[in-house]
Amino acid sequence: MTTRYIFVTGGVVSSLGKGIAAASLAAILEARGLNVTIMKLDPYINVDPGTMSPTQHGEVFVTEDGAETDLDLGHYERFIRTKMNRRNNFTTGRIYEEVLRKERRGDYLGATIQVIPHITNAIKAKVLEGGEGHDVAIVEIGGTVGDIESLPFLESIRQLGVELGRDRSMFMHLTLVPFLGAAGEVKTKPTQHSVKELRSIGIAPDILVCRGDRAIPANERAKISLFCNVEERAVISLKDVDSIYKIPALLTSQGLDDLVCKRFHLECKEADLSEWENVIYQEANPNGEITIGMVGKYIELPDAYKSVNEALKHAGLKNRVTVNIKYIDSQSVEAKGDEALAGLDGILVPGGFGERGVEGKILAAKYARENELPYFGICLGMQVALIEFARNVAGLTDAHSTEFNKQTPHPVVGLITEWIDEEGNIEQRDEASDLGGTMRLGAQLCHLKAGTKAAEAYGSESCIERHRHRYEVNNHYVKQLEKAGLVFSGLSSDRKLVEMIELPNHPWFVAGQFHPEFTSTPRDGHPLFEGFVAAARAHQKRSLS
């Protein structure tokens, strides 16, 4: 299969939405019957985002094969059917690590290792490998043109543009076209300078996507076309919209997909965006609204919980309600108690690491259990629910996780030292292992207990969900907790690890060790999030009646 490549760059400012634009174009091409994938090339020196602070970088998105990747890969999976894997995201750090490893082995036969050609060749090889087996591969370059960190990536795609030729490569550049209120007009000069910078590197953009808070007037598009040496029809206006799921229709209405198909000589059907039209209709026509309290420790940056936020919105679409998310600092729950949790229709405790705020999460689980408020725990959210139950129902005073208290008399959650990965290999770890290599990662099978809310939600005896955690429920306490009334509704493939828990005599108190948010999409939703939102809606109706 001959793969065509679209390289996406950004200029003027960061956070223009390159990831959303790339994903939207991919969605259109997929709707035309093409097999599309997307890659993200990150210029930072970290090997991967796995050990980066969520308040700086945002969420770490986990792929089926266990790669810890940039949150943009979450956008990609929510827009297209193709599943991402570790080939879809790599960093400067990863490239340098691999090149240096080869140098130490003597693979370069004593040559002087340089950015050109050794680093650029490694980047090109990964890009070509990631695109194998697809009609079109869209490659997003992180950062903005002019960043010193991005130069090796930009040089690599410049070389690929020459090597692949015009029939197999094209360049799409996102820029900002700001509106100045005092002048009463949009300004194109930042775009002109951004394109000038890109051309100085040797890359001439084929398509310009102009971001702004309003549509770009026709005369300004003509001006951009003239000064940036881009066809006028290839100057695309991408204004701010109230829903990112409107962007595919906005782009196809301006013929962006036709430009791509014509350039690559692709004969394919017209784009069928009916699924996206249905999503937009559901979003615009809710039958009510609910408020979900998200009790976390990284709430100052909502992107730290990006996939959870989106999964709640998707569940709202399926239940025809608007889901309002109230971010609650778990430390404020420690300080204010029940007052911090008043007025909610449901509580969600997402994943997290470290001791700060954990007692507030435990209090949130207690509040939900005692007040029959729908509760959904994810990863650490399951562990705190189990700790709370152990302390206050099973009578295990001072029960805790060894992550937070190594001297706890009842370590109901602990670090396991051996487990089987997705390929059946035995993995081992201990507390001295590097943080980047100590977690159970990726998609794994979970057996569901018949008659439970979990099995009812999935409509199946099993599910496959993605993991990202170091600590597990201590099997030593399972029978004691079961006797006290806790239901272990999901077990690992070998039935040795607890994957889900729930309370049988509660409207909806369900928690999982995995991260279901990573597989939720606007078109399909996710059964656990749908069940949680439905329970929250039912609780609201009971409260109002």
UniProtKB/Swiss-Prot annotation:
Keywords: ATP-binding, Glutamine amidotransferase, Ligase, Magnesium, Metal-binding, Nucleotide-binding, Pyrimidine biosynthesis. Its EC number is 6.3.4.2. CTP binds at S14, D147, I148, E149, K187, T188, K189, P190, T191, Q192, K223. The keyword Lipid metabolism does not apply. UTP binds at S14, K187, T188, K189, P190, T191, Q192, K223. GO terms for molecular function: ATP binding; CTP synthase activity; glutaminase activity; identical protein binding; metal ion binding. The active site is at C379 (nucleophile), H515, E517. PROSITE patterns: GATASE_TYPE_1. The keyword Metal-binding applies. CDD domains: CTPS_N, GATase1_CTP_Synthase. GO terms for biological process: 'de novo' CTP biosynthetic process; pyrimidine nucleobase biosynthetic process. Mg(2+) binds at D72, E140. PANTHER family: CTP SYNTHASE, CTP SYNTHASE-RELATED. CTPSs have evolved a hybrid strategy for distinguishing between UTP and CTP. The overlapping regions of the product feedback inhibitory and substrate sites recognize a common feature in both compounds, the triphosphate moiety. To differentiate isosteric substrate and product pyrimidine rings, an additional pocket far from the expected kinase/ligase catalytic site, specifically recognizes the cytosine and ribose portions of the product inhibitor. Catalyzes the ATP-dependent amination of UTP to CTP with either L-glutamine or ammonia as the source of nitrogen. Regulates intracellular CTP levels through interactions with the four ribonucleotide triphosphates. Belongs to the CTP synthase family. Homotetramer. This is CTP synthase. The lineage of its organism: Bacteria, Pseudomonadati, Pseudomonadota, Gammaproteobacteria, Alteromonadales.
